[in-house]
Amino acid sequence: MPLLFILAELAMLFARLDSEGICLHITVPQKIEPRKGGDAEGKVTYVITIDGKPYSLHLRNHSFLSQNFLVYTYNETGSLYSDSSHFLAHCHYRGYVDEVPNSIVTLSICSGLRGFLQLENVSYGIEPLESSARFEHIVYQVKSDSSMLAGNDSHVWQIDQLDKGHFNEQDKNHSQLLPQSLKLHIIVGKFLFDYMGSDIMAITQKIFQIIGLVNAMLTQLKLSVVLASLELWSDKNHISTDGNATDILQRLLDWKRDYLTLQSNEITHLLIYRRRPKYIGAASPGEICSKSYVAGVGMYPEDIGLEGFSVVITQLIGLHIGLTYDDNIRNCSCPSAPCIMQQGALSSSGKKTFSNCSLHDYMHYVSNFDTQCLGDLSNVHVLQPNQAVCGNGIMEAGEECDCGNETECQFKECCDHETCRLKGSAQCGSGACCMPTCELSASGTPCRKAVDPECDFTEYCDGSSSHCVPDTFALNGHLCRLGSAYCYNGRCQALNDQCVSLFGKGSQGASYACFEKVNSPRENLANCDSKDSYSVPCGQQDVLCGKLACFRPPKNYKSPSQSVVYSYVHDSVCLSILPGLSMRSDGRDSAYVADGTVCGPQMYCINGTCKEVNFTGNDCNATKKCKGNGICNNFGNCQCFPDYRPPDCNLQIGSPGGSIDDGNTLRTESAFATKRLSKNEDSWVILGFFIFLPFIVTFLVGIMKRNERKIVPQGEHKI
């Protein structure tokens, strides 16, 4: 398979490449409400100030997340799991600066403004100032030096791979191009995952910013990138990333064929960190519709910024769609140099455009090669707010079933995984209460077992739905572990248990001095109040709610490969781990103390803050409402003990207990009436037997005595 390399040989690049954050400005963005009526939906305007000069940012919503977008990560056991609940599709906007012609703005506007302002020859980054109580933001100039790549013209491109035809003036007209789209599956290698901070949410947001910049550049070709999925190799590299870019690309193609199940029009890009690579990537040229060969490898050099790396991704995509590097032979030019397919674009700031050569290459490619896999943009389904997503395994409004994607679906005979509609006469097609025969499970069948013996409860099928009832568990703040810990979201959040799960048997929670060392506010360690992937230093009252600190176990750790941080306090060794490397079953970072952990008398941790335990908003009093025969659950109802029947926990011998929320309809009055009738019938039979038993015994004894009297001894007869 012919390969084309992205060859920016970076011999002089590393002296001064994309040094961000030199000149800082503080601004408070002012949101300008749109006029009512007209085409105001999806539009917003912000005014920011840079160097005392106001700039108006006119933005329009531009969602580039696929309708089925998921983020895949690996937990500490190496198991792959996915999540889509944290990502807001309506946050991404694109627009321009009113005062600057030919400018481009790409921003995420949820929880503050994050992104880039690309003017004619300068770029600015903007992000919220998290420590500010006001809506203050930092604006910084993205520095670059295009002379770093000057004279470095040693890139390789094989022009005979694709017949470009002859460049003539009529090919310059690209107005006939139709809007099209391509889907991208991005994989972030382990080393880049660590280099970007090892935080899943933060890395995901960075990838979003990169794709926003890529789409801004591809607008000139009327091409839009839709991010289909994101895979983070948070545990390890699943292929070797040693060697040159071509070797890695070949391994990626082999791994992709064996392990990835993608739609036919999805491109896979592996992004890896390489401190000083000779090449910044490798791609298969002109293979956009070849499922077996279309892939790319992008290398993230040391100190490069997100803006610079977005050029790498754009060049990779350019090679897929038939573009080649610009050169002097064809007199390539663009309004603002350097052009995107030139090496100097990697270290340039400001708006970037394709050259006349790139436009010709693309026009020629779409006219002469197979591009059916490039979807019509009008038919691309991007994720919208509160929109049902078919294939995510969650049955939402408008769906009859949702058994996951083609690989995950276990009910292929019952549910169409592409339309989320039932097949034929199927009663169900997904869910814990759906049988392989496409029939509903019987009422009272367990569908979700308790994961904690004290704080979580088993749920049952109700016989009318294919899905298990909502999870029921003890009311947050209920005491467990003999009063030494609290229940929180169905788990007994004992500190020692959290340490054991990380470091193995024998581990236990560390002393206050250890927590104070690990989360010292004096050292400005941002380990508390984690919200929207941003953290702040722990206050003195919150040190027990930051990073988890444990004492060293007597034997080897449960996970020897875990990145352990050692702290020494009063001759004791305190253990903690780096964030982003280990996830609990609920998807939360194991490096931090779990919500609900005791941090003082009648106090527990919530979002990195030590707060008072209270039951405000819940009127369930177990002593009164449950008569002391049960505890309150998360719905404010009684979870009754065995032999007590919900909802009020009245005495009912033989009742399994439970609540009215757990789905077990066998506890209804009619069910118990039937059960009582059956028991009564059995009781009368037993009672009658014991009443007549003495008469039966007397009768049998009388018969035995009468038979004894009838026996006469016989004498001996002599002859």
From Swiss-Prot:
The prodomain and the metalloprotease-like domain are cleaved during the epididymal maturation of the spermatozoa. The chain crosses the membrane at residues 684-704. Residues 180-378 form the Peptidase M12B domain. The gene is Adam18. Keywords: Developmental protein, Differentiation, Disulfide bond, EGF-like domain, Glycoprotein, Membrane, Signal, Spermatogenesis, Transmembrane, Transmembrane helix. It comes from the Eukaryota. A tripeptide motif (ECD) within disintegrin-like domain could be involved in the binding to egg integrin receptor and thus could mediate sperm/egg binding. One of its GO terms (biological process) is spermatogenesis. Residues 1-19 form the signal peptide. It comes from Mus musculus (Mouse). It is found in: Membrane. One of its GO terms (cellular component) is membrane. This is Disintegrin and metalloproteinase domain-containing protein 18. Gene3D superfamilies: Collagenase (Catalytic Domain), Disintegrin domain. Its main location: membrane. Residues 20-179 form a propeptide.
